[in-house]
Structure formats: structure tokens, C-alpha cells
Amino acid sequence: DYLTTHIWPLNWGWVDSADLAGTWAGGEAKVRDYMARHQAIAGRLGKPLVFEEFGFPRDAGLYDPGSPTSFKDRYYRLIYGAVLDSAAKGGPLMGSNFWAWGGEGRAAHPDHRFAPGDRLYVGDPMHEPQGWYSVFDVDESTKAVIKAHSAELARMS
């Protein structure tokens, strides 16, 4: 028995994909507060907590594989830092699951939208642009952030 939460700064209006540089600080503060409040709830309930679904857009609101992910990488490091900090202190936050692995998948259409009959899937649901939150096989910096976090967790166990 454990608790889960989602964290979606863009969907919740905490950042603006057209101005990530200008809205990052405010969004980061809201994410930090949200994480702290949910860790406190988990602590009071005596339950482990997993940030089981979190994602962040690519820079400049782009969706294409290989487009810049500098703010996504910062966001992942923010989430992963909270997980590592909790693990080091014996806190309730036990893990996280990013949304979503797109791998070698690619959007079928230039507008990144699903069309009737489409079967290609890159992690983002069909009502969202494909590539919005996906981590693709060519996203080297994001993969490096994920790999470093995994290695740090392994060292702690």
C-alpha cells in the first residue's frame, strides 16, 4: 500500500512552453512546494510515496526528437534530487516514473497529432501531441540525467 502523485507543471499552468526561461523559477517553486506537501502527507500517513507520473516539455514547445531538452533535464534533476534527498534521509519519497519513453517511435504526421486509424505511439496519449513529453532514443542529455539518477540510487542500496 503506497501513495502516488502526478506532477505536470505545464498542464497545470505553472510554466509557459513558449517562455520556459521566463517562467521556470516560478514553476520550480510550485513544484518544490507540491513535492514537500505530498511528502508531508505521506509522512503523516506512514506510507511510501512515488512520483509515478511526471513530465516536462521540450524547449520552445517543440515535439521533434533531438530538439533541445535543457528545461526538461533541469526538471528531471529537480524530481530526482527530491527522490535522492528523501532516500538519504529515510523519508517517504521512494521513487519516480517519468512520462514517457518514446524510444525509436516517431510521430506519423508533421503536426504531431494522431489521426483516425493511426497505430504509432510514442508515449503521449492520442489527445496530446506526440513528442510533447516523450523521451526519445536520441535525447542524449535527458538519457544521461536518467542514467545518472539510476546509478546514484543503485549506489545507495
Model-derived segments and spans:
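Glycoside hydrolase catalytic-domain groove-lining segments
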Residues: 1-62, 81-84
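Aromatic-rich peripheral "rim/lid" segments of glycoside hydrolase catalytic domains that contact
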Residues: 61-78, 82-157
